[in-house]
């Protein structure tokens, strides 16, 4: 070896800095290290086409609709009993394993923000692929790989994992409620999801007070899907466990009956794995060495698989027939008295007292061995809790009711985050309308044409409603949309129904006035021709278009805001009030609204809202600046209305925000509201909130604001505002391919 080579040995090969320093791409001290509280705008630019190997023209719906669904189902049925030496199937059947995989893919969903769930296939990526609750599910996905490889682009990983769970149930004698495709894979972790602040797996710093779980979280510990099966904090208290179950399953949109059905149905199958000390289990997939090729949790006990498998740490099966649908779960739960014991791994679990049923359960891999059934603390909670107990007893006595409830709850679990039925694909979609799907009536009439739209616009313009009223009402209707679970939006006109009509952010008194005027216009139009109708949902959005067009005209721009009819009006009976309550914004920075005081800053909540609306940073900037000058704040607040000509679509917000003649001062120690004073005279010129000033404070947002503040940017601003506005108005138009 030459002296030159010897002198370079062990040094970094990348010339990004001084020779020999460790500055390869992506390493080194980051901005986040220097400024940990820096506003995270990266969540607005996730899932770039550059990260997607399928290409921008890839149409997954088209590909899925060309899939031979029955053929892939038969392949999945065959896989269930095709045990592999590298990961042998318990009881010779992979069904329970795939149920757990599908459940844990879907079970991260939470109602508070609609994030998590199965719809993006993110169990493939960190952190989910390495959560303690997902131990060994890397093997389940590898078992599926030959099928994924065979069918390629015709089925996403997200759909395949759920379909495998359905086929697993069916292969063991259970009749499922249905299956819908349509889940589109992402190609990187979802950075917008808040999983908690804990730095250690299974920590539970998310609780305060009397075990109050932090919002929007829906799991008791970092790295768990729901609850600790041993009991809260590992303590085998069944009633305390029931409280955790009710809280976490409720946050995942399940009521008490659905919760009991899911736990009982899921635990009818398979077994838990805790053959030995968890210290024998190696690094998770994300931390494992490169030679492991994405496999994690290497187990040094015995063969490291089969009888030696260590996953949850609990050990055993719930029923005597772990690969068949029956009523064995409730039979065991109610027909035995249970005593506390520990698994070989040291985890708390329960077995029948006095050795009862000691040989009723077959061994998963050795036909010469028999075992007693086991229950988790979270299972006995279904017997001991005063609310769960009668539900459990009813299912025990009426197995047909359990079967129906589990089928429906499983379908809800695995489809809750897919949005409305309009997004469902395939021949197995059930026909029954379910209220949690936020149903909207089909459009069975002729919709308005171009001339009708012009006539309706003229009537709205002559109605006496102001630009601010029209714009704020349309925004209130459409901006409930959440890209996380595809709920909300203008379609359905649910803004006229409970609970949305009563939300403070929607200014109920003004809203009622605007809706009354629009309903009169709707009624007059619909009386003319019974075959041609306009929905209130369409009219609300069209009213917003009128407001924007009038405001643009006032600034010297003649524009037409794109509008496509076809929305329908949902009924109150089609609207689950309790479920829709989760869509009420705690904050809407676009309307300068805060419902209360929060530990999260107003600007962070603005970015979070923008992310749920699938907006980019430029779209967020253009929209907020436009809504301010259109006077669309809640309560007509003048915070951020940096213009002397409100209801005119100008770039004044940006021009005046960046004016160095203004100096800003907080009005209190909380630094939530501010006054902008003339630097020379000290006279108050403007007032603002953090959601306004962040566009001058944050360097990235200021750079965008500067674009719109330039003297040659007025036309560009109007164009960009209208494009972003139209995007929000159509976010829930899944009928517009």
From Swiss-Prot:
Region listing for Disordered, in residue ranges: 1-32
E.C. designation(s): 1.11.1.21
Active site: residue positions: 104 (proton acceptor)
Example GO biological process: cellular response to hydrogen peroxide
Entry-linked CDD domains: catalase_peroxidase_1, catalase_peroxidase_2
Record note on cofactor: Binds 1 heme b (iron(II)-protoporphyrin IX) group per dimer.
Cross-link (Tryptophyl-tyrosyl-methioninium (Tyr-Met) (with W-103)): 226-252
Catalytic activity: H2O2 + AH2 = A + 2 H2O; 2 H2O2 = O2 + 2 H2O
Binding residue positions for heme b: 267
Top-level taxon of the source organism: Bacteria
Biased composition (Polar residues): 20-32
Post-translational modification: Formation of the three residue Trp-Tyr-Met cross-link is important for the catalase, but not the peroxidase activity of the enzyme.
Cofactor(s) recorded in Swiss-Prot or TrEMBL: heme b
Annotated keywords: Heme, Hydrogen peroxide, Iron, Metal-binding, Oxidoreductase, Peroxidase
GO CC terms in record: cytosol
UniProt-annotated site: Transition state stabilizer, residues: 100
Covalent link location (Tryptophyl-tyrosyl-methioninium (Trp-Tyr) (with M-252)): 103-226
Subunit structure comment from the entry: Homodimer or homotetramer.
Similarity section: Belongs to the peroxidase family. Peroxidase/catalase subfamily.
HAMAP family the UniProt entry points to: Catal_peroxid
UniProt-listed PANTHER family: CATALASE-PEROXIDASE, HYDROPEROXIDASE I, BIFUNCTIONAL CATALASE-PEROXIDASE
Identification of the protein by name: Catalase-peroxidase
Protein species of origin: Marinomonas sp. (strain MWYL1)
Lineage: Bacteria, Pseudomonadati, Pseudomonadota, Gammaproteobacteria, Oceanospirillales
Gene symbol of the encoding locus: katG
């Amino acid at each position: 070896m030459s002296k030159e080579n010897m002198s370079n040995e062990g040094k970094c090969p990348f010339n990004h800095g001084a020779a020999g320093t460790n500055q390869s791409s992506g390493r080194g001290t980051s901005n986040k290290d220097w400024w940990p509280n820096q506003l995270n705008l990266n969540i607005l630019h996730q899932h770039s086409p550059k990260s997607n190997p399928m290409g921008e023209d890839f149409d997954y719906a088209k590909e899925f609709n060309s899939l031979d669904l029955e053929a892939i189902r038969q392949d999945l049925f065959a896989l269930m009993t095709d045990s592999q030496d590298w990961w042998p199937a318990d009881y010779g059947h992979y069904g329970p394993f795939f149920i757990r995989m599908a459940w844990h893919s879907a079970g991260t969903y939470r109602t508070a923000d609609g994030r998590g769930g199965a719809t993006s296939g993110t169990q493939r990526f960190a952190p989910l692929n390495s959560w303690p609750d997902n131990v060994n599910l890397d093997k389940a996905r590898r078992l599926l790989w030959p099928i994924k490889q065979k069918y390629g682009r015709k089925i996403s990983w997200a759909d395949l994992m759920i379909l495998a769970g359905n086929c697993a149930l069916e292969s063991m004698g259970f009749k499922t409620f249905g299956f819908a495709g349509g889940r589109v894979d992402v190609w990187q972790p979802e950075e917008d999801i808040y999983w908690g602040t804990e730095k250690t797996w299974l920590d539970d710093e998310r609780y305060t007070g009397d075990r109050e779980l932090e919002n929007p979280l829906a799991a008791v510990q970092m790295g768990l899907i729901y609850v600790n099966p041993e009991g809260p904090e590992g303590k085998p208290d069944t009633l305390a466990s029931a409280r955790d179950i009710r809280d976490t399953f409720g946050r995942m949109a399940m009521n008490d009956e659905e919760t009991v059905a899911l736990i009982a149905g899921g635990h009818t199958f398979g077994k838990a794995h805790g053959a030995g000390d968890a210290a024998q289990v190696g690094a998770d997939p994300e931390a494992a060495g490169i030679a492991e090729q994405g496999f994690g949790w290497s187990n040094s006990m015995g063969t490291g698989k089969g009888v030696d498998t260590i996953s949850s740490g609990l050990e055993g099966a719930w029923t005597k027939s772990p690969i068949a649908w029956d009523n064995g779960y409730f039979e065991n739960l109610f027909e035995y008295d249970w005593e506390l014991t520990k698994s070989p791994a040291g985890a708390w679990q329960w077995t029948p007292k006095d050795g009862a049923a000691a040989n009723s359960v077959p061994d998963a891999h050795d036909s010469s061995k028999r075992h007693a059934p086991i229950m988790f603390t979270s299972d006995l909670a279904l017997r001991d809790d005063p609310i769960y107990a009668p539900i459990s007893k009813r299912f025990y006595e009426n197995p047909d009711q359990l079967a129906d409830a589990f089928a429906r709850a499983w379908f809800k679990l695995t489809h809750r985050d897919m949005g409305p039925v309009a997004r469902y694909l395939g021949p197995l979609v059930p026909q029954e309308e379910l209220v949690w799907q936020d149903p909207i009536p089909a459009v069975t009439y002729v919709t308005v044409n171009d001339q009708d739209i012009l006539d309706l616009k003229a009537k709205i313009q002559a109605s006496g409603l102001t630009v601010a009223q029209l714009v704020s009402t349309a925004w209130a209707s459409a901006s409930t949309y959440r890209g996380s679970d595809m709920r909300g939006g203008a379609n359905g006109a649910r803004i006229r129904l409970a609970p949305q009509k009563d939300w403070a952010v929607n200014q109920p008194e003004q809203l009622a006035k605007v809706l009354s005027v629009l309903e009169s216009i709707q009624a007059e139009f619909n009386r003319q021709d019974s075959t041609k109708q306009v929905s209130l949902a369409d009219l609300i959005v069209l009213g917003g278009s009128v407001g924007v067009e009038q405001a643009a005209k006032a600034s010297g721009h003649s524009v037409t805001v794109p509008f496509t009819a076809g929305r329908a009006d949902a009924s109150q009976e089609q609207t689950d009030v309790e479920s829709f309550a989760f869509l009420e914004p705690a904050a809407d920075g676009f309307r300068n609204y805060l419902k209360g005081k929060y530990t999260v800053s107003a600007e962070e909540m603005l970015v979070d809202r923008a992310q749920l609306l699938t907006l980019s940073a430029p779209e967020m900037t253009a929209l907020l600046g436009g809504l301010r000058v259109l006077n669309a704040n809640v309560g007509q607040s003048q915070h951020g209305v940096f213009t002397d000509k409100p209801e005119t679509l100008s770039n004044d917000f940006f021009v005046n925000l960046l004016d160095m003649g203004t100096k800003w001062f907080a009005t209190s120690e909380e630094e939530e509201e501010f006054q902008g004073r003339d630097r020379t005279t000290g006279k108050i010129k403007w007032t603002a909130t953090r959601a306004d000033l962040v566009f001058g404070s944050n360097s990235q947002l200021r750079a965008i604001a500067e674009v719109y503040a330039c003297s040659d940017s007025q036309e560009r601003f109007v164009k960009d505002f209208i494009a972003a506005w139209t995007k929000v108005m159509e976010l829930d138009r899944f009928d517009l391919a």
